[in-house]
Amino acid sequence: MKYQQLENLESGWKWKYLVKKHREGELITRYIEASAAQEAVDVLLSLENEPVLVNGWIDKHMNPELVNRMKQTIRARRKRHFNAEHQHTRKKSIDLEFIVWQRLAGLAQRRGKTLSETIVQLIEDAENKEKYANKMSSLKLDLQALLGKE
């Protein structure tokens, strides 16, 4: 495993994930009966400051259909948490207008690259174009100077 699991921290993430899903109207318990489900949710809500007990609640009450989705969410959150510790792995965000993002995403898809790789490629293309333009301008001036002397 690449990233260390931190039980207390991850239990808090699991609690937040389950509460968010409950508030969005998803069934987070394995119970069909509404009163049993509500009772289990009430117990979960009372465990906010008891991260160690959250795992027990999950084993006992959680809807089995949520298991894989929650694991994926926690794994992604763990990765972001550890990557945020280092400047070179930390994700940055930029504000793009939707139409700009849409065009960039389309270009990235056509080129078979990620958005970041596409942006780097566009920057390199612009830098190369600038170097080419400077070189051509310099050659043009040299040629004019050479022709002007004769």
Curated annotation (Swiss-Prot):
Tell me, what is one Gene Ontology molecular-function annotation carried by this entry?
Answer: sequence-specific DNA binding
Gene Ontology BP, a term: regulation of DNA-templated transcription
The record's annotation in Pfam families points to:
MatP, MatP_C
The domain of life for this entry's organism is Bacteria
List keywords of the entry alphabetically.
Cell cycle, Cell division, Cytoplasm, DNA-binding
Q: Which cellular compartments is it found in?
A: Cytoplasm
Q: What is its main location?
A: cytoplasm
Has the keyword Cytoplasm been applied to this entry?
A: yes
Q: Which GO terms describe its cellular component?
A: cytoplasm
Concerning HAMAP family, the annotation shows: MatP (MF_01073)
Q: Partners and quaternary state?
A: Homodimer.
Q: What is its biological role?
A: Required for spatial organization of the terminus region of the chromosome (Ter macrodomain) during the cell cycle. Prevents early segregation of duplicated Ter macrodomains during cell division. Binds specifically to matS, which is a 13 bp signature motif repeated within the Ter macrodomain.
Protein family: Belongs to the MatP family.
What name does this protein carry? Macrodomain Ter protein
What organism, scientifically named, is this protein from?
Shigella boydii serotype 18 (strain CDC 3083-94 / BS512)
Upper lineage is:
Bacteria, Pseudomonadati, Pseudomonadota, Gammaproteobacteria, Enterobacterales
